[in-house]
């Protein structure tokens, strides 16, 4: 279920809430067009008494589009949401394409964050090293979003028409066993429908990933920060998490979870959420 607020510039921002009804707050920033990480974290958050705030970036769900936006624009939107909901401080948990947005908030308003937890960290895709280390699907999408968005849009539409089979077929081998869990399967299919069903927003999100972040990371040690990544993650492998840690001064610990890709990071959700709220 979505709610909305009006932003100072007149745009709307939509968001969902999950987890516990009361308690410390964690803001969840997932990859392009996705609330999936928030839904996946929700059962653990309820058990731990943690509220989850899941905001939608511009052009997604009920959030009004903002053409030409960059990651550096996001903190103002997130801070406006926190103010509207009378939330003084929040932990931040990101995944994949949400990495840079979380770093941007940490850099802009460190006093509003309890901690920054980065799952499946994605380094800036502006360097050749980052592009080559990324999975083939992500690397191709970034290239097409920059050079031939019409080709990418056609591909997204074709994949959407072939759901759910196309979504299952694209799941890496390390993650496929987790689809036996009805919750994970449902979240994955719902997320893919949202991503593929809104190709214009999806392409804009990928374009943002293809550009420089446009932010100066927070000084090392200002905000407690940690990274978790799956040993077998194909889209954003451990090399990306290490690049992000280096970008953040080299101090944040990188935990490589053995034998799993992205979905298998669910085993560390309790640790991630506790870290995010400073427990």
Which residue ranges define each predicted feature?
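Short beta-strand/loop motif that positions the catalytic acidic residue
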Residues: 221, 227-229
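Conserved acidic catalytic loop of the alpha/beta-hydrolase fold
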Residues: 73-91
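The feature captures the conserved acid-bearing segment of alpha/beta-hydrolase catalytic domains
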Residues: 212-222, 238
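Conserved alpha/beta-hydrolase "acid-adjacent" motif
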Residues: 234-240
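Conserved hydrolase catalytic core segment
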Residues: 89-132
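Alpha/beta-hydrolase
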Residues: 136-140, 146-216
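Conserved HGGG/HGGXW glycine-rich cap/lid loop of the alpha/beta-hydrolase fold
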Residues: 11-62
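Catalytic active-site module of serine/aspartate enzymes centered on a nucleophile-bearing elbow/loop
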Residues: 248-279
């Amino acid at each position: 279920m979505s709610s909305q607020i009006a932003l100072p510039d007149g745009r709307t921002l939509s968001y969902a809430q999950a987890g516990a009804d009361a308690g410390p707050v964690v803001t969840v920033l997932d990859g392009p067009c996705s609330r999936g990480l928030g839904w996946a974290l929700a059962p653990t958050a309820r058990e731990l008494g943690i509220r989850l705030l899941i905001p939608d970036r511009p052009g997604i769900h009920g959030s009004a589009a903002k053409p030409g936006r960059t990651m550096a624009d996001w903190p103002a939107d997130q801070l406006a949401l926190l103010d509207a909901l009378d939330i003084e401080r929040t932990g931040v948990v990101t995944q994949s394409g949400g990495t840079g947005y979380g770093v941007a908030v940490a850099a802009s308003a460190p006093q509003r964050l309890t901690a920054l937890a980065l799952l499946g960290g994605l380094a800036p895709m502006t360097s050749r090293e980052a592009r080559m280390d990324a999975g083939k699907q992500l690397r191709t999408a970034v290239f097409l979003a920059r050079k031939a968005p019409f080709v990418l849009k056609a591909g997204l539409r074709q994949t959407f028409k072939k759901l759910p089979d196309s979504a299952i077929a694209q799941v890496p081998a390390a993650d496929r066993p987790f689809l036996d869990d009805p919750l994970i399967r449902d979240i994955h299919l719902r997320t893919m429908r949202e991503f593929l069903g809104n190709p214009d927003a999806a392409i804009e999100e990928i374009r943002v990933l293809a550009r420089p972040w446009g932010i100066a990371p927070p000084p090392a040690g200002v905000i407690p920060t940690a990274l978790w990544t799956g040993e077998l993650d194909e889209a954003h492998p451990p090399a990306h998490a290490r690049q992000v840690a280096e970008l953040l001064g080299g101090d944040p610990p990188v935990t490589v979870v053995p034998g799993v890709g992205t979905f298998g990071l669910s085993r560390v959700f309790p640790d991630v959420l506790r870290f995010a709220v400073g427990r």
